[in-house]
Amino acid sequence: MTTSDVPSSSIPARGGAPRTLGSSVIAFTRQTWAGLRVLLALTVLLGIAYPLAVTGVGQLVFPWQANGSLLTADGSHVTSPAGNAHGPAIGSALIGQSFSGATWFHPRPSAAGTGYDTLASGGSNLGPTNPTLLATVQERRAQVAAEDGVDPSTVPPDAVTASASGLDPDISPAYAREQVARVAAARGLPVARVAALVDQHVRGRTLGVLGEPRVDVLALNLALTTMAP
């Protein structure tokens, strides 16, 4: 009898006894059940336990940061939009918002929606040689120079370009210092006092090497409201 004459169901499996249809189904069922158990275990561990643990640690160790880094009008840190006895939260130290008028330090431009739209975070996606971007930058440079009373060639880049998120809360120390004279004059404050306030709000590079020195616009403007002429 040749191999071709032997029924396929009785051909011995490599290294063992013949495998029947029933044994194949049992093996498949066992493998499937093992895979489902691994899936279930990882779902509970990584989809439920781990997020809850991280959330719990965040609430215990970094409650302010974990709840959005919210600030009230007097600069107090709160963990809820409802705020505290000093009033409701008016913004986040991590989210840029619009300030207009000569009495405030201005943030960098925003391309998020119609401007500072948290539901449409993003940049303009225009390349550095795009005519629309170049025209917009020139227009912004002229406007900022006129507002701050400086030469257009000295306007810092972040004063005329939007961030990748459109929600950058920070500006460069150079842009903050450029606005000092305007803000001081509008509020009737000595230039030296406003300049000192800016210096107090300059934060260095993260871990000493990451990013650039920066100034949080919301925190700076909140501190500005406490200064009397």
Please place each PLM-identified region on the residue numbering.
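Flexible, solvent-exposed loop/hinge segments and secondary-structure transition points
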Residues: 2-27, 34, 46-47, 54, ...
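Extracytoplasmic/periplasmic C-terminal soluble domains
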Residues: 178-229
